[in-house]
UniProtKB/Swiss-Prot annotation:
Top-level taxon of the source organism: Eukaryota
Protein name per UniProt: Homeotic protein antennapedia
Family recorded in the similarity comment: Belongs to the Antp homeobox family.
GO molecular function per UniProt: DNA binding; DNA-binding transcription factor activity, RNA polymerase II-specific; RNA polymerase II cis-regulatory region sequence-specific DNA binding
Principal location listed in the UniProt entry: nucleus
Span list, region Disordered: 44-135, 256-300, 368-394
Biased composition range(s): Low complexity: 71-83, 111-135, 258-297
Pfam families, per database record: Homeodomain
Alphabetical list of InterPro entries matching this protein: Antp_homeobox, HD, HD_metazoa, Homeobox_antennapedia, Homeobox_Antennapedia_CS, Homeobox_CS, Homeodomain-like_sf
Cellular compartments annotated: Nucleus
Task of the protein: Sequence-specific transcription factor which is part of a developmental regulatory system that regulates segmental identity in the mesothorax. Provides cells with specific positional identities on the anterior-posterior axis.
UniProt gene name: Antp
Gene Ontology BP terms: anterior/posterior axis specification; negative regulation of transcription by RNA polymerase II; specification of segmental identity, thorax
Amino acid sequence: MTMSTNNCESMTSYFTNSYMGADMHHGHYPGNGVTDLDAQQMHHYSQNPNHQGNMPYPRFPPYDRMPYYNGQGMDQQQQQHQGYSRPDSPSSQVGGVMPQAQTNGLPTGGQLVAQQQQQQPQQQSQTPQQQQAQQPQQQQQQLQQLPQVTQQVTHPQQQQQQQQQQQQPVVYASCKLQAAVGVGLGMVPEGGSPPLVDQMTGHHMNAQMSLPHHMGHPQAQLGYTDVGVPDVTEVHQNHHNMGMYGQQQTGVPPVGAPPQAMMHQGQGPPQMHQGHLPGQHTPPSQNPNSQSSGMPSPLYPWMRSQFGKCQERKRGRQTYTRYQTLELEKEFHFNRYLTRRRRIEIAHALCLTERQIKIWFQNRRMKWKKENKTKGEPGSGGEGDEITPPNSPQ
């Protein structure tokens, strides 16, 4: 154990002698544990919260969260107004000091960077005990700095580039920067997404991301009308009106419409909102005989009832008029068998079909044969040749 402790002390002394003073070898710090680093931070981070009142309002851009996306405008104001606090920047948490232009006797950015480089190996060479002793101090500093306004950290190289960009036209590195600056100037970005507002927190940001999926719910509390973007309620009303207009175009029938209108809707555009309209969706399978007064639909053969008086017509029996019967009897008296040519002529003359003419003549011959059988059977053999001649065309 003694060898290990001696080795640890020798290694500790090796690192601490080269980078630390004698009073800081074993974790003993002067005063209240505040190092020179905190004294340097006092130049840059003012502990007076009322000091922020010196900043002009409105700032550019007029949003507190915009410095996360655009650090150029805030750096210009920091060069003009010294002492404006940058509380929870990473440089204050890790022990670095943010560079600042040399004004009113303050150190320049190059000197602060050199001091930061000297202090970084000191922090690396500290033992775990010393780091644990510094942790509560750093946590207290962070708690004091949290209530102040959050801003973005810029390094010396970025500051030099931003000074060059002041003379040159601004070129944005990403679309988010351009959208954020455009909203700050009062322009609406191409995507149509509303800007970030002062009171907007992470919950409101999530609600903003899910806004297109919940257009039906008005979200006027987000304050989108301040920047010239139309209100969500107006968008919802326009969406509702367009939906009603689309329903009128699709041909959804009114409540009292007959079922015939439902039958002819297949010729129009597809009905998208028909199933979502209660009271207007009538089943197309209603019986046409029970329809209300209005346009009477034509009675097709497949619509006729299979029972009742219409059952006799199912046999297809044709009723001939007295004129048609008289003309057919005349033709049968002169010729009991018809040729095809004569059959066509009679069909056109009597407004009948060839099949009807053929069937009538067949029935008439059978009737005539029965009449001859009943009159005298001895003469039926001689009359048989007249009934069915051998060369009669059928």
